[in-house]
Amino acid sequence: MARILWVSDAGRATGFATVTHALGERLAAMGHDIHVLAVGWDAKYPVPGPLQLYRAEAGPARQYLGLDRTLELVEHLKPDIVLTVEDPPMVWRRFMDNRFDPDKKVLKRQPIISYLPIDGYGVPPQWLTLKRLVRVVPYSRFGAEQLDMDPDEAIPHGVEPIWRPFSKAERLTVRAKLGIEPDAFVIGRVDSNSRRKDFASTWKTINMALENGWLPEDKTVALFHTKLIETSIGVNLQTLISRGMGKFMVTNEVDWPVEQVVELVNCFDVTLNNSRGEGWGLNILESLACGVPVIAPDSSSIPEVVGDGGVLIEGRAEMTNPYGVDWILSDPLPMALALREMYNADATLRAKLADAAIKQAAKFNWDESAKRFDVVIKEELAKA
């Protein structure tokens, strides 16, 4: 089996870290020796499990992303494979434009596998060049198509068994703990507060539904697991909420234990996602696994994740991000109308929607994804 230097988030509550532990721990169980350059890990406490974590900021330059540790760890560990779970610009920077590795020693030494999220349309030529430098594995079929690759080369994310639908009694218990009425209509979202995630449009959608009387103000609760104020990369939700109607609950946290987040999601009647683009959409998939239907834009990788487990709404316009990639802006009006339809659904229809969400989530399995990565790793070792 292979010794692998894994480069990504680890030991923290981010999407990249979830992927690191879900895939990395399964590959370790198959016999691979996995060492992680753990971006964002503070090393305050050990992380249980088979992965050996190395703090990214422990290098001589204390560089947050561990750019100064990549070559150091390659020379120390002598891995058979380097495997990254990072955005394409970061992969390029780490291996092609890294002032701590000007001779590109890491790129030349061993095979590199890059598990890539593609969250928009019209990718830069630089990203296409990565295919000649590393083994690119897209998250999604959408991402593969944008990279001019066979969609079957994509390896999807999975969902852990802890993400499950609660019984009615369990749901009511959790709602009571949070001070939410048993018969409230709860619109939820678990996500980072960033420009791409566009929480402002989530607020606008809910507020529009309330202002037009499509949802009852006294029965509607918006429950967000995100930072309340994140003006450097996202939006000041506190300001938006003060401008509108309804009851909003914001955890102002991002690092809850996963068990607590599962409880939170099981309070939702519907997940409302207004993201401008997703490389995969892990929080969407986890909502579906809890039997919570999703309303989301019909763009990027989102349709292949949502499938029959929710309602997809066409976006209203394109916007170009700093990398020259086009995102799609969600349309609050039809999404607000979809919320109205979800609220008006009777018990039978809601049960059907929940069942469809669970069946859609069951299509994605971390065990199967890890097996496919094992094949990719062995293919790269055979070429080396």
Enumerate the language-model features and the residues they cover.
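Conserved donor-binding/catalytic core segment of Leloir-type glycosyltransferases
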Residues: 5, 181-197, 203-206, 222-224
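A short, well-ordered alpha-helix in the C-terminal region of glycosyltransferases
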Residues: 341, 348-363
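Nucleotide-activated donor-binding/catalytic signature segment of Leloir-type glycosyltransferases, i.e.
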Residues: 234-263
